[in-house]
Structures are given as C-alpha cells and as structure tokens.
C-alpha cells in the first residue's frame, strides 16, 4: 500500500513537472495575429521555466545565443488591447498544470530590452479566491494588456508567469525547487505617437528579482501554507501611465 501511494505521488510530481508553458501568439483588439512562435515571439527552445534568478534567460526565457530579433512585429496603437495566448505543447491544449498557482505580469521595454517598465499585474484575487494562473486556465490561456500611449517605435512586451507550487524555498538553496518563472517576449511596433515615454528608471532582467524580493518565496501548500491574501507580486509597481490589463 505504501509503495502504491509512493508511486501515485511520484506520478503526480512527474506530470506536474512536465506541465510547462510559453506564448503561442497574440490578438490585437480580438483579431488573431497569426502563430507567433519564432515569428514575432522570441520563442524559447523549450517550454521549461527559468529558476535561476541571475540567468540571462530571465529577460525573455532564451539564452544569450538565441536572444536575437525575430523577423516580424505586431502593429499596435496606444489604447489597443493586446491579448497573449499561452500553450503547453500545442495550441488550445492544457496551457499549464492547475497546481502552478501564481501571478501574471506584463513589462514593456524599448526594443533593446535594456530596462523594463511594469504595465500590468495580477496576483491573487480575494473576491474569487483565485490566482491569476487559475483564471488564465479558465480563459483558455489568454490574458490582456492595454498598450500605453507611448511614442511611436519598436518595443518589446515581456509577459510573465511566476508559478509558486515549489516556491516554499529559494532555488539557490534547493535547485530541485524554487519559483518557476515563465517570461516571454513579443516584438511590437507602436504606430500611434503618444506623449507618455517609458520612464528611464525601469528595472533590469536579470536583476529585478532576487531571493529577498517579496513574492519569490511563498508557500502555497498546507500544512504551512501562507495566506494568499497577503501575497505581494514581485517587482515594482505598475507604471502610473499604464492603463493595465486583465486575466
């Protein structure tokens, strides 16, 4: 009986460990922009998370050798709604394991990706008692952000999931565990010419998150679960010129 129980737990762990995710493509004002993998999404080679907070992959979930411009860009204007569509292995599949509770955030940068400004953030909703990832799954893998009224030009959008199912301990203390970060960068061109330039004091990836950053270490499981209502999303506050987003 003990052996069977152990096998069941092991099977659950294996299934959970493989239930990773990345961005497939985006919509602009509800219109699908075509498959983005390696086209306008700087797609990572796998759907694996980034756990080392000092890794260059914290920027776009690609290593230095793959961090280059892909051939296309998505045209948007200030005030447009851009929706990201995540997937696991195939479009419209299970998106991500239901155990991977955590926040979803979006950052914006100039095309060089040197510094990043947070333009949307969603963590734990006390009204519905759900995490942003829970609602992402219910929404078929889609969440949205409103493009700020920035000057015309080329930009990067960095959508991010931080899965907390193993975040009870820091990765550098136990590399088997630690928060699982899923960043994904989409290339856009803003065609309108707004007046709200991105602030010069954005954060850097890697560097924005450390083990001491609130929201990186957080225990969501009993018997020592922390109250999710106290959860603080990692990183800076959302830019006050950003209209925000939704899941």
UniProtKB/Swiss-Prot annotation:
Binding-site residues for Cu(2+), renumbered to this chain: 20, 100, 182
Catalytic function, reaction form: [(1->4)-beta-D-glucosyl]n+m + reduced acceptor + O2 = 4-dehydro-beta-D-glucosyl-[(1->4)-beta-D-glucosyl]n-1 + [(1->4)-beta-D-glucosyl]m + acceptor + H2O
Signal sequence segment: 1-19
Protein location: Secreted
GO biological process: cellulose catabolic process
Record InterPro entries: AA9, AA9_LPMO
GO molecular function: metal ion binding; monooxygenase activity
Record carries keyword Secreted: yes
Pfam assignment, any one: AA9
Recorded GO CC terms: extracellular region
Entry note: cofactor: Binds 1 copper ion per subunit.
Statement on biotechnological application from the UniProt entry: Lignocellulose is the most abundant polymeric composite on Earth and is a recalcitrant but promising renewable substrate for industrial biotechnology applications. Together with cellobiose dehydrogenases (CDHs) an enzymatic system capable of oxidative cellulose cleavage is formed, which increases the efficiency of cellulases and put LPMOs at focus of biofuel research.
EC numbers, comma separated: 1.14.99.56
Sequence positions that bind O2: 165
Glycosylation (residues): 193
Sorted UniProt keywords: Carbohydrate metabolism, Cellulose degradation, Copper, Disulfide bond, Glycoprotein, Metal-binding, Monooxygenase, Oxidoreductase, Polysaccharide degradation, Secreted, Signal
Record-linked CDD domains: LPMO_AA9 (cd21175)
Obligatory cofactor(s): Cu(2+)
Family: Belongs to the polysaccharide monooxygenase AA9 family.
PANTHER family: ENDO-BETA-1,4-GLUCANASE D (PTHR33353:SF17), PUTATIVE (AFU_ORTHOLOGUE AFUA_1G12560)-RELATED (PTHR33353)
Known function: Lytic polysaccharide monooxygenase (LPMO) that depolymerizes polysaccharides via the oxidation of scissile alpha- or beta-(1-4)-glycosidic bonds, yielding C4 oxidation products. Catalysis by LPMOs requires the reduction of the active-site copper from Cu(II) to Cu(I) by a reducing agent and H(2)O(2) or O(2) as a cosubstrate. Shows C4-oxidative cleavage of amorphous cellulose and soluble cello-oligosaccharides. Also active on xyloglucan, mixed-linkage beta-glucan, and glucomannan. Not active on crystalline forms of cellulose.
Protein name: AA9 family lytic polysaccharide monooxygenase A
